[in-house]
Amino acid sequence: MALNNFLFAQCVCYFLAFLFSFVVVVPLSENGHDFRGRCLLFTEGMWLSANLTMQGRERFTVQEWGPPAACRFSLLASLLSLLLAAAHAWRTLFFLCKGHEGSFFYAFLNLLVSAFVVFLVFIASTIVSVGFTMWCDTITEKGSTPHSCEEFQETDLELNVDNSAFYHQFAIAQFGLWASWLAWLAITTLAFLKVYHNYRQEDLLDSLVHEKELLLARPTSRTSFQGEKSAVI
């Protein structure tokens, strides 16, 4: 019963990781298409007036687009999380239906993979959160403009890109990444508990085998001692 509960908890966590990763992949892919391969994260720019005699900000000019590697890394990390979560969810569901338990090697390998994904998704989450905050600070000039970052997606920035949904896309991506990270953190914790349980179980089995050998050796020792005593008499 305990094994089934443990496998069910793992299966639920894998399903959540798959779901949240899917939530990340879709908006990031859409944003890459809308921005024609340009990366919004860490983009530098400023507002310029078309006529220096006029007051107010009329046109946003990008000085340097963000590094494409930032968006690609976040998308690839989400795809890797999606595929691994799907594969492990299927395997765990198979174990749950059959009532089987994985080997110690599989549990240890699962721990390593889960820890690696936790690290990878954490980096991707940080990149997206920090990069998107820098973009919003740039177009709002750190809050000095009359419009918020979300409101600017309703304004044509004239950057030769489709910026009509960038805020919602990255808001959803941020939520999905951090939620996926929490799901993988729970998976890693369960994997560690599984490895620790298997390690303690193997120690217990070794102790039982050792005690059995000692018990089997005691009658032999008593018999030899009685034989020596009879010979002396």
Swiss-Prot record:
Chain segments annotated as transmembrane: 6-26, 75-95, 104-124, 170-190
UniProt-annotated location(s): Membrane
Species this chain originates from: Mus musculus (Mouse)
Family (UniProt): Belongs to the TMEM179 family.
Mode of membrane association: Multi-pass membrane protein
Keyword annotations of the record: Glycoprotein, Membrane, Transmembrane, Transmembrane helix
Record-level GO cellular component terms: membrane
Sugar-bearing residue positions: 51
Protein name according to UniProt: Transmembrane protein 179
